[in-house]
């Protein structure tokens, strides 16, 4: 278990972070690893009672409810599944679908922010002062230029950068194994953007930004931080000369300034300056940036204290 917030080392990390205008949020975490996680999930599935049926590879199409305010079930894969109780957990990829369903049902919604940024990859030694103490370090920064909320997310010591497919849109993510290790640490730097009226399509906005990277790079783009600062694209040769060996060699060397708006780039650059005070070397010109990473969130639904919508048992 990592991240005992009462440890002396955690207190020192908080002090260093505060001096760099960063808020350090400790989290106690037990790391399983992608390889072990699949075993645990299989054990959970096998432990379910015999009268529980799990239907996989089947997307929910429509939520059914009557005019009297009671949920009836769902339509999925050409079948109708009736139920007394319905729990909706659409995940990030289902956020847009769930928003449409909520509107169709007349549920009161409030748009969430969208998080847009990059996946960072550096030598693992750079972040060892943090990751040895707290595996999942959460650092929050409010940018000087725009007062935007910028945060680190999903840190993977000795991990790997991977492609994530969001309904045909290729974005980036990261993971780590329990046994197999790389020489790098990766994590996301995300800028949170909450839009105001009249614009109310944060998911569409995030997908558009991600589509620009796909258009320019036929998938995710990778760029050295130094090249981005100097206003030039990264090339295969520049990546090869760098000190960081990319764990996702399929990414196309390119220029993220052609993808991310200036506001997001400025926020990310400021975040690196702050991180460098806590983990010297974070702001190195050899640091690799993969783009883009986007986190979509479902709209907030008006709920009772029992987490129930206006439809009974939903």
How would you describe each model-predicted region?
Residues 1, 5-314:
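Residues forming the flavin
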